[in-house]
């Protein structure tokens, strides 16, 4: 009795463990909407992180340039000990005694002292010592290099922020493309499942007809061939879904591929909703042609501004620089402590550099003019891109409406051919062709819907929305 109870407990425990490990992955699956996918990509994608690092580096560079407005303070210290004095000389005291004084000295000094005055004397100084100084230099005029350098650093920070926005737009676009590609493949898989169910029903009808002797076995073989084709399509779609999941997971920084995506499954209803809101949401307006709101245009403007500042910097490098300063110094070179303070002014005038500097200024002027013309040229291209994006939205929307009507027509055509075949007035090839047209209309509708969503995103980005 005890053994039987133990076996029952083991079986119950085994069932519980089986259910736990069977349903745990399903419950652990996360569901992502399109916005969540884009948010995850913006947070985890390497391109966006790299652009953010660029913004932070540009900010530090701007702060570094700001310090040039303030005095430059430096300190210097030196201690030395030489093997002999660095200042050495030999002097004869008699050479420094004037002739008028020599007569009186000869009369008053003994002969030994007079003889000593004629011997050379060696003098040695600065064998060891300590030197220290503290200097502060304030630039007064530097040819505008400090001011223009700070402006250029600010432009660099603005450029890095614009590049971050462009990186975010590109990442958002790619993530949404992957999302709708996965939606398209999943919807096609649903179509394959629906067609497979339809073919199974047709197979049952044909099998009954063949057994009754009112249909040929060839009809049954045609249905089986079409079923094999559907199985082949299912395998390709499964592989495609797996690859897109991997790409989406890597691009958005998701931990694994065991996730599902949430979207409006009723494509037909969404198309009708889009048709009603199209005129309200995506009508061409004045903002569409306002290129100044685009990051690409602003980036070109910053390029012109940077070229102009670089030209001014080249001019400033050939102008005189003026600075004032103050310092405090200490030394004990003469074996006694000595300290003193001082103020000074410096003027530096480039002379030979003017020759090469004049060519540098001309080169910067050419680069500035090139940036101006590039701005004009790319502005026209941005206008064309806006118009092309709007045309793409209109075209994809019309394609979507056509695909919607094609589904209705293909559905009715399939219904009629199925009734005709049952009545014996149509061939199996006509019925299978109607089934193929129905499947193609569903797939085209799925592709048109995904393309419409991508075109809307391109339009929003092309118009700076």
What kind of region is each of these model predictions?
Residues 1-35, 40-42, 452:
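Bacterial Sec-dependent N-terminal signal peptides
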Residues 39-49, 56-71, 122-126, 134-151, ...:
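A glycine-/polar-enriched beta->alpha junction
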Residues 76-135, 265-278, 325-360:
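Small/polar, glycine/serine/threonine/aspartate-rich low-complexity segments that form flexible
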Residues 74, 81-97, 256-259, 444-465:
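Acidic, low-complexity, intrinsically disordered peripheral segments
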Residues 50-65, 167, 173-190, 201, ...:
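Amphipathic alpha-helical coiled-coil segments
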Residues 28-86, 140, 255-308, 351, ...:
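Bacterial Sec-pathway N-terminal export signals of envelope proteins
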Residues 2-3, 60-62, 164-291, 392, ...:
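Periplasmic alpha-helical coiled-coil/stalk elements that build and connect Gram-negative outer-membrane
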